[in-house]
From Swiss-Prot:
The gene is rplW. Gene3D superfamilies: 3.30.70.330. This is Large ribosomal subunit protein uL23. InterPro entries: Nucleotide-bd_a/b_plait_sf, Ribosomal_uL23-like, Ribosomal_uL23/eL15/eS24_sf, Ribosomal_uL23_CS. Part of the 50S ribosomal subunit. Contacts protein L29, and trigger factor when it is bound to the ribosome. It holds the Pfam family Ribosomal_L23. It comes from Anoxybacillus flavithermus (strain DSM 21510 / WK1).
Length: 95
């Protein structure tokens, strides 16, 4: 099994993701090869919480061009993790 910190890359901080935090839904950018079970186990291991559901979205790389050179940006994979109602919250920000 992979190390949990290799599966979870970073939290996604957007206006929509901060609104979802009130519903105990947290958004993370994850490894493109990780599946839902690996994401669930990694979140539970890193943060010590109980995960109820994991939704995953794939993003293709965007076409970019610099002068005569062209290519694609890296593809991404985003996971929205829903915690159980009795689980503690994840502290992403230090207040």
């Amino acid at each position: 099994m992979k190390d949990p910190r290799d599966i979870i890359k970073r939290p996604v901080i957007t206006e929509r993701s901060t609104e979802l935090m009130t519903e105990k839904k947290y958004t993370f950018e994850v490894d493109v090869k990780a599946n839902k079970t690996e994401v669930k186990d990694a979140i539970e291991a890193i943060f010590g919480v109980k995960v109820a559901k994991v939704n995953i979205m794939n993003y293709k790389g965007k076409f970019k061009r610099v002068g005569r050179y062209s290519g694609l940006t890296n593809r991404r994979r985003k996971a929205i993790v829903t915690l159980t109602p009795d689980s503690k919250e994840i502290e992403l920000f230090e207040v």
